[in-house]
Structures are given as C-alpha cells and as structure tokens.
Amino acid sequence: MALEELYREVILDHYRNPRNRGHLDAPDASAEGVNPLCGDEIHLELALEGDKVVAVAVEGQGCSISQASASMMTEAIKGKTRAEIEDLTAKFRLMMSLDGDGDLDLDPDRPGQVLGDLEALQGVRKYPVRIKCASLGWTVLADALAE
C-alpha cells in the first residue's frame, strides 16, 4: 500500500469513526468555530487538571478533512500539558505550511511519531483552500485554552 493511500485510509477512519465524540459533563474550557468558506463546524470541550488535558470531547459537522483532523487532534492532546499542546500545535501548523511534496521530518530519530496520525494530513497542504478545514480544530483548541 502506498503511503498516500495509507494516509487516505487514516483520514477516512477518523472521519467515519471519530474519536472522543460527544460532550463532557463539566468541561473546564470550551470553544467553537466555523469555517465560513465551507461551513465546517467544531465544538470542543476540555477537562483540565492543573495544566494537563485529562479529557476532551468534540462535536461538529463538515467535510472529512475538518472532522478527521479534529478527531486526530483530540487523540493527540489527551494527557498533554498546555506547553506540550503549544509545541504540537506549532509542529502541526508547520506541517500544514510547507510547500511542495516533501515529507515533514520533524524528528529524524522518531519518523512518523512526532505527529502520529496527524501526519496523514500532510497532503492537504497541496490544496491551500483545504488547509483551513484541517486547521479549524486547532484554532478552536487555541481559543479553548485561552479561556
């Protein structure tokens, strides 16, 4: 299976079987966002213990890219501190901003492990209009953490 096909399967899996879907009983932080260009919607809730995200829930509707990205993001941030999430967010945004077809190599000692499933979204950067779809959840996350 080619890498691009594998990435497509990862995206479709997260779209069809979104992780952390629903609501939290008593979220410590929440935010929502809409991509006005295509109508994607994300509502995110976080439970925090100190500086660490201990639970996360997401609801939304929209294209497969926005919903899969939000699902992957919730998996990636669970158990992480704000500082770790800021670092992860910066790496995700870097990946989405790169030009060309080259693979992102954020950590040569751990290829494919820095962003995990999120690396499946690398191909989106070839379609600039879709970058906002993939980034919506991350924008909502930043808003929630800024509360």
For the regions a protein language model found, what residue spans apply to each?
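Short, thiol/selenol-centered motifs that function as redox-active sites or metal-ligating centers
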Residues: 60-67
